[in-house]
Amino acid sequence: MTAETETGIPGVPGTQAADQFNELPAHVWPRNAVRQEDGVVTVAGVPLPDLAEEYGTPLFVVDEDDFRARCRDMASAFGGPDRVHYASKAFLSKTVARWVDEEGLSLDIASENELGIALAADFPGERITAHGNNKDASFLRACVRNNLGHVVLDSAQELELLDYIAAGEGKVQPVLIRVKPGIEAHTHEFIATSHEDQKFGFSLASGAAFDAARAAVNAENLELVGLHCHVGSQVFDAQGFSLAAERVLELYSRIHDELGVTLAELDLGGGYGIAYTAAEEPLNVVEVAHDLLTAVGKTAAELGIEAPTVLVEPGRAIAGPSTVTVYEVGTIKDVDVDDETTRRYISVDGGMSDNIRPALYGAEYDARVVSRFTEGETTNTRVVGSHCESGDILINEATYPSDIHTGDLLALAATGAYCYAMSSRYNAFARPAVVSVRAGAAKLMLRRETLDDILSLEV
């Protein structure tokens, strides 16, 4: 039998592949994740099996120092914490809002309840930006009353409504206009947000963006301070960011020439790709920031306008790599796929209710046993959840050690973004707990839901 047929990994014998399975790729796992001599994985000095025993599984474990370090990395790359707005849609709690505040970053939110969470954490309204394509009067009124630093306008209807609400409150609301520069991001269709045929923003090509800018400039209770664009999420082609900036700056020039207004800010959103598996490489944010800021300065000079301050909105790139989800292995079965192929199905005690991304986007993850070393030969494996849904798959195709057994703790890395945030109660599953770890100590951020929580909504 060749090494390739043993493992599915060309040139890698089974035992060597098992050794690789014991490794924790540094570009995927939290910075403070370590496999100890007994095979147990710790994060920030806290053994994951101890956390699983205390808080149950599934369990989200957040490396606080990793999260904070990524905030500082972004601030350093883009010229200061005031230039960086953490995209709270990735994952938000009062604790996270406090971390972001303490690191000096701003915050972007996309619903009235996200705003409520931020305010409950005493996050300053002046450092909050409100997003959304369908903000209602209640949401907009809350933005104005809490003195939000920016409201990102997404439609002519919203522009008129916000002007009316601000007038009623006796205030002038700073706004950005979301622009579609027509860039096709190299990402999944559902997370590409800058092409023409989608729900967000005003078209640059059709002239709708300029019309919106003119309306905002003429509105008595709005202050147009800049433009916003976002090419997509989990983007690895860095050229798209610079190209989008160049196209949007042409609108800055037109606004300056025809409306006599110099816009001070350019918000280029986020979308910086991270590694979910060992085979992937995260986008180098330092290089992207350098290229982006250089492109903005160069293009502004060519257009004869003052270069605006560049703002960015990373979410996944901060929250994603800081977190792992710990599951307990349950049922294991071998399924004959055809006459020559057998696939091992490993079921865990969570699934699409705590991580919908594989089902929704075809997202790929990698897993590791974190309660011990694995030593077995490898086998074709699929990791699935416990839900009554054939698409409840966490890892579709993998080659994992054959000695994984019921009761093992299996962890998926890079689950800090869009996992808990998009969680559900499908099959009446209770949402998992979220625990932060730092310097050998754990702190409960969000408790595990109970049946009583689910029943509390009944009337």
From Swiss-Prot:
Q: Where is the active site?
A: C388
Give the N6-(pyridoxal phosphate)lysine positions (modified residues).
K89
The signal peptide annotation in the UniProt record is none
Database matches in PROSITE patterns = ODR_DC_2_1, ODR_DC_2_2
Q: Which residues does the record give as pyridoxal 5'-phosphate binding sites? A: G271, E313, P314, G315, R316, Y418
User: What GO biological process terms are annotated to this protein in UniProt?
Assistant: lysine biosynthetic process via diaminopimelate
- Note the InterPro entries from the entry: Ala_racemase/Decarboxylase_C, DAP_deCOOHase_LysA, De-COase2_C, De-COase2_CS, De-COase2_N, De-COase2_pyr-phos_BS, Orn/DAP/Arg_de-COase, PLP-binding_barrel
Q: What is its EC number?
A: 4.1.1.20
State whether keyword Amino-acid biosynthesis applies: yes
Essential cofactor(s):
pyridoxal 5'-phosphate
GO MF annotation: an example:
pyridoxal phosphate binding
UniProt entry tagged with the keyword Amino-acid biosynthesis? yes
Identify the metabolic or biological route this protein is part of. Amino-acid biosynthesis; L-lysine biosynthesis via DAP pathway; L-lysine from DL-2,6-diaminopimelate: step 1/1
Binding sites annotated in the UniProt record for substrate: R316, R357, Y361, E389, Y418
Q: Which UniProt keywords apply?
A: Amino-acid biosynthesis, Decarboxylase, Lyase, Lysine biosynthesis, Pyridoxal phosphate
The reactions it catalyses are: meso-2,6-diaminopimelate + H(+) = L-lysine + CO2
Q: Which family does it belong to?
A: Belongs to the Orn/Lys/Arg decarboxylase class-II family. LysA subfamily.
**Assembly description:** Homodimer.
Role description: Specifically catalyzes the decarboxylation of meso-diaminopimelate (meso-DAP) to L-lysine.
What is the protein's given name? Diaminopimelate decarboxylase
- Provide the species name: Corynebacterium efficiens (strain DSM 44549 / YS-314 / AJ 12310 / JCM 11189 / NBRC 100395)
Write the gene name: lysA
